[in-house]
């Protein structure tokens, strides 16, 4: 099975961001992983709030994946 990681923010409504990327990957038979750059409070009408991940935390997320799992694809949005 092919593997991929999405590096993006969340979308609490599920229509974009990591949630949408993971749905797309799974639909296409890809093992999906993620590194979260920001948490958002949003719905279909707009974004209420954004909490950005620190560069250090993002680095820890990526190190955790890269030291354990071979990646076939990286999606950065």
PLM regions with names:
Residues 1-72:
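Small-residue (G/A/S/T)-rich helix-start motifs and N-terminal tracts that mark the onset
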Residues 76-77:
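Conserved small/polar residues in nucleotide/adenosyl-binding loops
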